[in-house]
Design a protein with these regions (language model features):
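Residue-level recognition of short, solvent-exposed, well-ordered loop/turn junctions
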Residues: 4, 19-21, 131, 155-156
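Catalytic-pocket segment enriched in acidic/His residues
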Residues: 56-170
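Short helix/loop capping segments that flank catalytic or ligand/cofactor-binding pockets
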Residues: 5, 35-37, 57-59
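Extended, compositionally biased flexible segments
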Residues: 1-12
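Short helix-loop capping/hinge motifs at secondary-structure junctions, enriched
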Residues: 32-35, 87-89
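Short, structured patches in soluble enzyme cores that scaffold and shape functional sites
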Residues: 13, 22-30, 48-53, 82, ...
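N-terminal accessory regions of nucleic-acid-interacting proteins
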Residues: 33-47
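General beta-strand structural signal in soluble alpha/beta enzymes
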Residues: 3-4, 49, 138, 162
């Protein structure tokens, strides 16, 4: 599903609930297995912008794993940059936003993340080895289409623009 930050997004055939999610991406730089939160920073190469697109019907209404709604072709734009960890003073205090067709849909901050970067790396490393190049998408702020009343979803031809402070824009 991973594509470049400016590649076209293709809404899947039979999709009616394709949704957007601006997220902080954490790029692993050193193998991590069973590490503590205090050790997590040693395993980070850097950070990037991720649009963790989701097809909500595939994800939630067709039973089973969420992977069906998260792994559609072109659903993982990443970048435009890998910003090394030494260039990010506090990954838990970055503004983030996403516009659809010029309208601001998400306007948040990494400081409102349910789980911090160090916790996520430590937690995941207890269940799987994290390898250099792995990217962890850390969650999205309010403003996804599924959460609106009435719900709003992407249509072919819609344009998204998103960014995270200091990490660039897509």
């Amino acid at each position: 599903a991973i594509v470049g930050p400016n590649d076209d997004i293709h809404i899947p055939k039979n999709s009616q609930k394709s949704d957007w999610e601006v997220e902080l991406g954490v790029v692993i730089g050193k193998e991590a297995k069973y590490i503590s939160e205090d050790q997590a920073q040693e395993h980070i190469a850097g950070y990037c912008v991720v649009n963790d697109l989701s097809e909500r019907a595939f994800q939630l209404e067709h039973s089973g794993q969420w992977v069906k709604g998260k792994s559609c072709d072109t659903f993982g734009p990443i970048g435009p940059y890998l910003v090394t960890k030494d260039e990010v003073a506090d990954p838990q205090n970055l503004s983030m936003w996403l516009d659809v067709n010029g309208k601001r849909m998400q306007d948040g901050s990494t400081k409102t993340m349910v789980y911090g970067v160090n916790f996520l790396i430590s937690y995941l490393s207890k269940f799987m080895s994290l390898q250099p190049g792995d990217i962890i998408s850390t969650g999205t702020p309010p403003g996804v289409g599924m959460g609106m009343k009435p719900q709003v979803f992407l249509k072919p031809g819609d344009e998204m623009k998103l960014g995270i402070e200091g990490l660039g824009e897509q």
